[in-house]
Amino acid sequence: MEERMVSAEAQTEEAAVEQGIRPHSFEQYIGQEKVKQNLKVFIEAAKMREEALDHVLLYGPPGLGKTTLSTIIANELGVQMRTTSGPAIERPGDLAAILTALEPGDVLFIDEIHRLNRMVEEVLYPAMEDYCIDIVIGKGPTARSVRLDLPPFTLVGATTRAGMLSSPLRDRFGVMARLEYYNVEELTTIIERTATIFDTELERDASIEIARRSRGTPRIANRLLRRVRDFAQVSGDMRISSSRAIESLERLQVDRLGLDHIDHKLIKGIMTKFNGGPVGLETISATIGEETDTIEEVYEPYLLQIGFLQRTPRGRVVTPLAYEHFNMEVPNK
């Protein structure tokens, strides 16, 4: 699968860039107002009681700021944050080493927490509930279990697939917050903030053009801004205009709704070869040369979200909205 300009997943070279533009406080964090206001209250209450904040689960689509929020939680609490991920914790001993190194009140951030294996998860239960872990020392008949007390800490888990979390793990989170897609106004503000950090001048209309194509996702917005800035810089533009932004985005093959060439290929393929559907997933896969899992998990969600595609018992169907976007007539069936 090729790397896409409009993918919400973090790309290899983006970690350092994202670190440099990441907000560090709730005041700097744009959007997610309900989540933000609730977290402010929970954090303030925990500080007033001099207790560790309840464990927090942040879930929702990729690229919406779950890692950033976890950093802000630690900053607002005035504690250190230890970062890891579900796939990185392979054995119970790995988790035990992380937990025993925590200081009182610290935040442990586990990204992709749905990918923890079951044995590791079982070590996490008493750690979350009672701030202790049981470890086995020795082997065979001489093996014995030793209980280690842990300092009070806050686990912040992040996942794009909350449904894959086991019930025992999910039930141990005192705070659960779903992050939603951003609107154009919020994304415009984010783009303007990032442009200021990059020392890049751009017109308000240019920010709006980039925001419209960002699929409601800050990560995509910031990526598109960086690429538009490249085009402007090489062209000698001191200030990014709306026309420069539009021209650059067209060269990147990102249309006014954030659809790229793969989206066009998929939708137009169903329109022209199958009269708009219904058509089966396997057939689409053969037509565009992509795996069925990739189509279902990567390409289709946004097309479903904007109402361009429907899943029916008989297969995929392109909607009249999609025909309108591509200036094509809806076929008579």
Swiss-Prot record:
Pfam family of the protein (one): RuvB_C
GO molecular function terms noted in the UniProt entry: ATP binding; ATP hydrolysis activity; four-way junction DNA binding; four-way junction helicase activity
Residues annotated to bind Mg(2+): T67
Subcellular location: Cytoplasm
Single GO cellular component term: Holliday junction resolvase complex
Keywords: ATP-binding, Cytoplasm, DNA damage, DNA recombination, DNA repair, DNA-binding, Hydrolase, Nucleotide-binding
Disulfide-bonded cysteines: none
Ranges where the record places region Small ATPAse domain (RuvB-S): 183-253
Region (Large ATPase domain (RuvB-L)): 1-182
CDD domains the record matches: AAA
Entry annotated with the keyword Transmembrane: no
InterPro entries, sorted: AAA+_ATPase (IPR003593), AAA_lid_4 (IPR041445), DNA_helicase_Holl-junc_RuvB (IPR004605), P-loop_NTPase (IPR027417), RuvB-like_N (IPR008824), RuvB_C (IPR008823), WH-like_DNA-bd_sf (IPR036388), WH_DNA-bd_sf (IPR036390)
GO biological process: DNA recombination; DNA repair
SMART domains xrefs: AAA
SUPFAM superfamilies recorded: P-loop containing nucleoside triphosphate hydrolases, Winged helix' DNA-binding domain
Record-listed ATP binding positions: I21, R22, G63, K66, T67, T68, E129, D130, Y131, R172, Y182, R219
Keyword match Transcription: no
Gene3D superfamilies registered for this protein in UniProt: 1.10.8.60, P-loop containing nucleotide triphosphate hydrolases, Winged helix-like DNA-binding domain superfamily/Winged helix DNA-binding domain
Region called Head domain (RuvB-H), residue ranges: 256-333
Catalytic activity: ATP + H2O = ADP + phosphate + H(+)
Family: Belongs to the RuvB family.
UniProt comment concerning the protein's domains: Has 3 domains, the large (RuvB-L) and small ATPase (RuvB-S) domains and the C-terminal head (RuvB-H) domain. The head domain binds DNA, while the ATPase domains jointly bind ATP, ADP or are empty depending on the state of the subunit in the translocation cycle. During a single DNA translocation step the structure of each domain remains the same, but their relative positions change.
Function: The RuvA-RuvB-RuvC complex processes Holliday junction (HJ) DNA during genetic recombination and DNA repair, while the RuvA-RuvB complex plays an important role in the rescue of blocked DNA replication forks via replication fork reversal (RFR). RuvA specifically binds to HJ cruciform DNA, conferring on it an open structure. The RuvB hexamer acts as an ATP-dependent pump, pulling dsDNA into and through the RuvAB complex. RuvB forms 2 homohexamers on either side of HJ DNA bound by 1 or 2 RuvA tetramers; 4 subunits per hexamer contact DNA at a time.
HAMAP family associated with the record: DNA_HJ_migration_RuvB
Protein name from the UniProt record: Holliday junction branch migration complex subunit RuvB
